[in-house]
Amino acid sequence: GESRSLKKALAEVAEGKAYLLQGGDCAESFAEFHPDNIRDTFKVLLQMSLVLTASASMPVVKVGRIAGQFSKPRSAPTEKKDGKELPSYLGDNINGMEFTEKARVPDAKRLFRAYSQSASTLNLIRAFSQGGFADLRQVHLWNLGFINKKTKGKYKEIEDKISDALSFMEACGITPENNRRLRTVNFYTSHEALLLPFEEAMTRVDSTTGEYHDTSAHFVWIGDRTRQLDGGHVEFCRGIENPMGIKCGPTSKPEEIVKICNVINPKN
């Protein structure tokens, strides 16, 4: 249901009726896993989305690069340091970042830890997004604090506009206490579908539609290094109904991207 809701929201973005805001770490790690870090990422994205909504007068679809973004695509299977060559670091869910032979040995147990961390992160995000932490007035106060301390009024005009809107709604009796939409947000998760065995293990059949969904995230994408038309990543992604993206780099050719889109989404 959540993936379908995101797909509908992204359709609004494609039609120019909404904005997409996606943000988060390049790669999550075990060492930096902490509720405060998750809270801060969530908080910043909420602050940014409020400013975008106020400036453009359009809804903002909020997607975090979080709760599963562990794997790192590498250009080479090995790396050298001080004359020593070791297997490349592939992400905390595969091997360790430390430049030692022991750390660079792939360990399947890391997948269980990554799964557990992702589940905990998602549960905390759901609590933040639905439990009152995302109260519109609170997000506005965060922005006001940022403006007063950091930017010397650079964005004061926008925040004054938000203050006036909140005051008007409150005068009309529309408050977070009696309107759930003012104290909750829809927040979605995303990551690159790089490690196919893990993504396959997380794929389930929707009993109501018979469609396949990758339950490791709401939104997944194919990376610049793995978007070969005859490759496994395109083959996997064409079989799931999640909303998805294709990363396009400097080497991307328009005709190639069109072919990939036709394979992944032949219905459109």
Predicted feature descriptions by range:
Residues 27-28, 32-268:
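Active-site-facing alpha/beta catalytic cores
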Residues 1-19:
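N-terminal basic/disordered segments at the start of proteins
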